[in-house]
Amino acid sequence: FTAYARVWLTSQDLETVERFIQESQPLPEAVECHLMAGECDVMLRIVAADLTAYRQFQIDHLTRIDCVHNAKTEVHMEQVKLTSELSV
């Protein structure tokens, strides 16, 4: 099960961003972490056994990071393309 968590931090200053990065690094469920330009501050790709396991991760870990102001989850309905090929 894969979910994407859009995360808003309490502030966008360097200290807050670095604190989030440091606290999210040890979380094995968070397989990707991207600092974003746009609506949210961070986008995480989370891999869990199922939706229940993801919800437990969100409750136990993600929303307990003190600099997380808000987190919203996106779940894809169907993967229609995945490639690593680049035409150069």
Please describe what each predicted stretch is.
Residues 1-88:
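A compositional/biophysical signature of low hydrophobicity enriched in polar/charged and small residues
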